[in-house]
Amino acid sequence: MVKVVNSSGKHKTATARATVMKGTGKVRINKIPLELYTPELAMMKISEPLLIAGNDVVSGLDINVDVRGGGIIGQANAVRTAVARGIVEWTNDTAIRDNFAAYDRNLLVSDSRQKESKNFGGPGARAKYQKSYR
């Protein structure tokens, strides 16, 4: 039986589901290879857990990620969390887990912060409409 690990990551309204399996080192996000993923900043954010884990670990894995919702950077953060969790679960290596935690805790723990909702009396969550006294 083929070993397959499923993991997920969230950031704001973006949700990513990663599937990690034995392979040749291919990483795909929504069926697009990581090397072709745009913008470059998002691609660099997603590649962080791959660089920290090391080429010897990642070269033997295929990682397919499906991400929905949110914006570009929110999706990138959700993907990097899902990928990091998948690698940790696949390897069962505490050293890799510790390296991820030391670099950025959000690689393993989803960022639960949400947008503050708009309130009455103003255009946004905190701002108020201008008041005239005369």
Curated annotation (Swiss-Prot):
Record flagged with keyword Ribosomal protein: yes
Superkingdom of origin: Archaea
InterPro entries: Ribosomal_Su5_D2-typ_SF (IPR020568), Ribosomal_uS9 (IPR000754), Ribosomal_uS9_archaeal (IPR019958), Ribosomal_uS9_CS (IPR020574), Ribsml_uS5_D2-typ_fold_subgr (IPR014721)
Disulfide bond entries: none
Any GO MF annotation of the entry: RNA binding
Any single Gene Ontology cellular-component annotation: cytosolic small ribosomal subunit
Region annotation (Disordered) ranges: 114-134
One GO term of the biological process aspect: translation
Pfam family, one: Ribosomal_S9
Family (UniProt): Belongs to the universal ribosomal protein uS9 family.
Protein's recorded name: Small ribosomal subunit protein uS9
